[in-house]
Amino acid sequence: TSKEMEIKLTNVARASLEELMNDYKDFLRIRNLTIWDKKHRYYSQLTKILTAKDATYETYRKGIESPDPEVSANVMIGLINITTYLLAKQIKTMEKEFLQEGGLREKMSQARMDVRRNQK
């Protein structure tokens, strides 16, 4: 795929995750459950788990599969927050590379011009 398409598709993925996060928040609101903020008693514990190095599904299993819907929804919100943050960083890097290196069409045009120049 072209750099342009990679950027577009990554943006679509980020936007889809943000919609999913809003769905989790709506789920909590409709059920009068709490969306955890920094003041919530579980917030620091959740942050510690979410920022664990070399995390796997097992790292989050207890929270995701919790029988308490408030816990599982807030864990998912946290995971989505981290994922969208990382995708935003990736998009910035991809855009920077695109500006510096150009896209596929530009590279193909440059290659054609180089061939023409060398033929003369």
Predicted regions and their residues:
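Amphipathic alpha-helical assembly/interaction segments
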Residues: 1-120
